[in-house]
Amino acid sequence: MRTNSSWRSRARITRTGVGAVVVAALTALGAVAATNATASATAPAGKPGGLSITKQDFGQPVVNPYTGNPEQTFRYTMTNARGMKIQLLSYGAITQAIYVRGKGNQFADVVLGFATLDEYVNKVSPPVIANGGPYFGETIGRYGNRIAGGTFMLNGQTYTLPQNNGPNSLHGGLVGFGNHIWHQVGGLIQTKDQVGVTLELVSPNGDESHAAGTPGCPNGCTGYPAQITVDVTFTLNNQGQYGIHYKVTNDDSKLDTVVNLTNHSYFNLAGEASGPAVNQRIQINADKYTPTNSTLIPLGSENPVAGTPFDFRQPTPLGNNIDNCTTDAFSCNQLLTAQGLDHNWVLNAQTKKTTGPDGLNLAAIASDPGSGRQLTVWTDQPGVQFYASNFLNGTLVGISGHTYRQTQAYTFETQHFPDSPNQPQFPSTVLGAGQTLNTTTIFAFS
């Protein structure tokens, strides 16, 4: 069993010297965005050239849930010498598209997403959708994954959050960081080594507080303690590395808080319109995983993956394990409860062999034999949520007009463990008053 540790052991920490408005704004936000007529973003990558980044308006102004005022949103397009192209939105700090070269010099968009802002506003994760939406490409926060019962205790104080996923809070609550408008900090990054941009969100003390009777908050919700400032820097280099660096500062001088950020991109290396990804090979650098109860909250144990459908220590076709009920009854029940794979893997301790760019630890490798594309995930986080799009039910149409269904993509959500605020044996997600954390994940394509 892993002993309790703090953010200090997982990331650099340094000492540095509302609800009603949000719900109303979300309703208005959807109405304003409905006028959006943004063209599809399915154009293939350009001819290989140097590193570049551009910025353009994306859709019509939408309402900022924090202020209630309409704001313009933007799309950033990063390209490298290989012709790889990444499109990033200031709405939700969403990764909209990633075009990667494959066999025969063919490019494909390898993440699921929508073509228009209207679709992101109305279909990603607003509270009008039961149990949230798919969170395509979102920057997830303030707390990624689930918190049991939508409640946790910190320093003797009980905090309550919206129960937007059955009895639990999922991916931050009713709004989450993915439904907010992020703002660019500084100029566009463009050096000989990389291009990129930093997007910022200030999450106030009491974020996700809601009045009694609000969906998911029958008795009202206190929201999260402490104001935090979140800066996420997205970069692309000529090696095909898509870097995501999170910097979170607790702006409060007295209140601690909990933080667990991640990226919720859905990958299909054959292309987002290619159908099931069951033949793609998955490898996860983990000897253990955290099994869950009937509502997908960890039981508190770290179970060996050996001899179970959760064993991806060697490259394994996704379809071999996703519905494998032939090993043991416990594992079978885990798959049935989650309708497939939707679990947290406990990443192995870093070794010289598993150390990659920026000194990060190997989390996972995915590959597609047909296209020849490969994705390697590097991180400093202790876990990764591997989710095989179990709940995509054919009601969403993607960026190229293709209908998305189960097993057509998968996520590698690098993270601290689900429900860590309620499970002291897990690595701690507490960010103390005045502290700053830094954490990085790299998605490397080849």
Would you name each region that the model predicts?
Residues 2-41:
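Secretory targeting and sorting signals
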